[in-house]
From Swiss-Prot:
Quaternary context: Homodimer.
Major localisation: cytoplasm
Species whose genome carries this gene: Actinobacillus pleuropneumoniae serotype 7 (strain AP76)
Subcellular location(s) of the protein: Cytoplasm
An annotated Gene Ontology molecular function: preQ1 synthase activity
Pathway: tRNA modification; tRNA-queuosine biosynthesis
Active-site residues (renumbered): C187 (thioimide intermediate), D194 (proton donor)
The protein, known as: NADPH-dependent 7-cyano-7-deazaguanine reductase
Enzyme class: oxidoreductase
Record key words, sorted: Cytoplasm, NADP, Oxidoreductase, Queuosine biosynthesis
Physiological role: Catalyzes the NADPH-dependent reduction of 7-cyano-7-deazaguanine (preQ0) to 7-aminomethyl-7-deazaguanine (preQ1).
GO cellular component terms attached to this protein's record: cytoplasm
Amino acid sequence: MNYNDKSLSALKLGQKTEYKSEYDPTLLQPVPRKLNRDGLGITEQQPFDRGADVWTCYELSWLNENGLPQVAIADVAIDFRSENLIESKSFKLYLNSFNQTKFASLEQVEQTLAKDLSQCASGQVSVKVYKLSAYTQQPIVDFAGECIDEQDIQIDSYEFSNEHLASVAEGEVVEETLVSHLLKSNCLITSQPDWGSVQIHYVGKKLNREKLLRYLVSFREHNEFHEQCVERIFTDLIQFTQPEKLTVYARYTRRGGLDINPFRSNFESVPQNLRMARQ
């Protein structure tokens, strides 16, 4: 990726910013997916053909027609085929612009979000806005699968390398789900830490747990957006393990009232958006 690309240098990330409280869709800033995908060899149908960037928006507020503040939580799913991902700070600033703006109904807010986000992403975006009473009924969940974090191994290098995956696939073909809560990368622009959990569901030769964990830990000083990290994990696993089926799903902790949960697969549909303990 060219980190000096004009589409990145214009981002609000890392810059002193004015917080607007009147509705302004121009605050949204796109980042072309191709900046990262070209280097990974990703096309519209390869190596994954389904997925979304699932966002949870916890700080959503507006005024009703009487001027009384309203609060809600929104689930947003940006289709993986969209031309752009949406830069997170611009998303936060955009949501803040609803704060002193009157909307006739929750449905109008939902429709406005879907329209603006679809335009910024240049692709399909689905939005569901929930009253707090509805959202509080949702459970806190954990990823299904075998957690690989409790290994007695020594690590002294935290520089990203996909070479940790060399010969990671060994033995018989299995179907299994592996989980790690040790995923940590850094924002591409600001280098702020991004903390996440990752779930890998695959059909293929059995993966060596130690090598896989070393690979995931090597993201610890790596600078890339959430969505790009998940796509890199997916393409690296395809390259080194050649599985028959693969899903990579990460759920990151929230920042600025937003969490981002990228899902990529070549055989499964996007799951329900259920938060985990750190979210």
